[in-house]
A protein has these predicted regions:
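Long, internal low-complexity/basic segments
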Residues: 112-152, 161-167, 396-405, 410-454
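Metal-dependent active-site segment of extracytoplasmic phospho-/sulfohydrolases and closely related
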Residues: 56-58, 106, 110-144, 183-224, ...
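Histidine-centered active-site microenvironments of extracellular/periplasmic hydrolases
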Residues: 72-73, 193-286
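Loop/turn elements at helix/coil->beta-strand transitions in domains of secreted/extracellular proteins
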Residues: 53-60, 200-206, 366-368, 384-389
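Beta-strand elements within well-structured catalytic alpha/beta cores of enzymes
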Residues: 44, 58-64, 177, 181-184, ...
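Short, solvent-exposed loop/turn and secondary-structure capping segments
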Residues: 1-12, 20, 61-63, 70-80, ...
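C-terminal cap/loop subdomain of S1 sulfatases and analogous C-terminal strand-loop tails that border
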Residues: 249-278, 290-410, 442
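Formylglycine-dependent
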Residues: 1-82, 87, 95, 101, ...
């Protein structure tokens, strides 16, 4: 399970090359079969065991690749979900949302996002797209400012528009993905069981977290950029899906936008976008000494809170002593501005908040009490200090064609189904001004042409 050309493995500064002679998965190597999730788990267990006699606390980071593409998983997980997803995107997504409501994960009256509209061909780009004279709409320049250009957009077909062959291939992609998730769960179980076996489980803080929303690339008809769904439904290709068959398409197979919308349910948009489906991720925490499940934490938290939380668990106070000025004689810029002193080095301070108070129940309410935002690929969002409002910018054609910032009332519409910016001009105006002020203060520069990694 290794995407072509986009990953590397090192141990103690030495490259590990899976599949090569003498290397994991290669001739004469150990293990004989390399699957990253299995390999990482066993390596991490060996690291824990190598130092367990020193009596010191340990920090272990299991940075799994799975279930990121390529869609590959070994037996017995490869065929475990055969036929489970034949009902298609809508049926599976609706069933998941119903179960979320039944479990109390979302309110019974939660209004989910229905998915992006179908266009089976590229949404047209503006005439100047790709030319030197193009003036692309971005988060600071809208159509009202004279900027009107954007590139083409593509959206996957709905299930009802797929041919029988396309449905066959699409269902198989999700079967493989589900197998990858269960294999990941199995390996996490091995880690937890090992902690129990060595008597450390009850004394260990464990956090499981995804790094982003569901992966929806490529936003195009068909989920494999090197082969069509129709071709993937034919033998011998179909039977080889999910295996490392040595072909380039095996190294790039993914499940596409529509299954990503299923994974992101009940939220809007996917990885790379600032909609709730792109920025909301599952997190599960086990506290030292915890013996039973605790209530679900519903406060807004951010990945930057993790470091502050880990330090709090270890009883370490984050560094706060301001660093002395270090002015560049050529530019006049203080290179230590905003930094603090740590171990005689000048570093940026920990910006997150410890989650221990809310996790243990000693504090309630919002973790972040100031406006909080994020940005990727020029796609930005900002939450209001009270957590109610969310200003969001997405480039056309998936965002508004005039380039305006959208506004959602998260208190009643976390599914982001209704843009209420026109009804609340002062709210959206304040949030956008706050975002622009922050960008100006930190020297943030918007890309001239916002677009994602795809």
């Amino acid at each position: 399970h290794e995407p072509a050309g986009s990953s590397n493995y090192t141990e103690d500064g030495r490259y590990v090359q899976p599949g090569q002679p003498g290397q994991p998965g290669g001739t004469g190597g150990s293990p004989a079969v390399f699957y990253s999730t299995d390999f990482y788990t066993q390596k991490l267990i060996s690291y824990i065991d190598a130092n367990k006699q020193d009596g010191k606390p340990f920090f272990a980071y299991a940075a799994y690749t799975s279930p990121h593409w390529p869609l590959q998983v070994p037996d017995p997980w490869l065929h475990k979900y055969a036929g489970v997803y034949d009902a298609g995107y809508d049926a599976i997504r609706n069933a998941r949302i119903a179960r979320q409501k039944a479990l109390g994960l979302i309110p019974a009256d939660f209004k989910p996002f229905d998915g992006l509209p179908e266009t089976t061909v590229a949404s047209p780009a503006t005439a100047n797209n790709g030319t030197a004279s193009a003036k692309y709409i971005n988060a600071v320049h809208s159509a009202a400012d004279g900027y009107s250009d954007y590139g083409p957009g593509k959206v996957d077909k709905l299930w009802s528009s797929l041919s029988p062959a396309e449905r066959k291939a699409q269902a198989r992609y999700m079967e493989i993905y589900a197998g990858m998730v269960e294999n990941l769960d199995y390996n996490i179980g091995l880690l937890i069981q090992h902690l129990k076996d060595i008597g450390e489980y009850g004394n260990t803080f464990i956090m499981f977290q995804s790094d982003n929303g569901a992966e929806g690339w490529p936003i195009d008809s068909g989920a494999d950029p090197t082969a069509t769904d129709t071709a993937n439904a034919q033998e011998p290709t179909y039977s080889a899906l999910g295996t490392d068959n040595g072909k380039q398409n095996a190294q790039r197979l993914q499940y596409g936008l529509r299954w990503a919308e299923v994974s992101a349910a009940p939220f809007r948009l996917t990885k790379g976008y600032s909609g709730e489906g792109g920025v909301s991720t599952p997190t599960i925490v086990h506290l030292p000494g915890q013996s039973q499940a605790l209530p679900t934490l519903r406060a807004f938290t951010h990945v930057t809170d993790n470091t502050a939380t880990f330090l709090a668990v270890a009883g370490v106070t984050p560094p706060s002593q301001p660093a002395p000025p270090l002015v560049n004689t050529l530019t006049g810029v203080d290179q230590n501005k905003g930094k603090v002193v740590y171990n005689n080095r000048y570093v940026y301070p920990v910006t997150g908040q410890s989650l221990l108070p809310v996790l243990t129940g000693s504090a309630t309410g919002e973790v972040h009490t100031t406006p909080f935002g994020d940005e990727a690929y020029g796609r930005a969002y900002l939450r209001s200090a009270d957590g109610r409002w969310k200003a969001l910018w997405t480039e056309p054609p998936l965002g508004p064609l005039d380039g305006h910032w959208q506004l959602y009332d998260l208190a009643s519409d976390r599914g982001e189904t209704t843009d209420v910016s026109a009804q609340n001009p002062s709210v959206i105006g304040t949030l956008v001004d706050q975002w622009k002020t922050y960008m100006g203060n930190v020297g943030g520069v918007e890309p001239l042409r916002p677009r994602g990694y795809y």
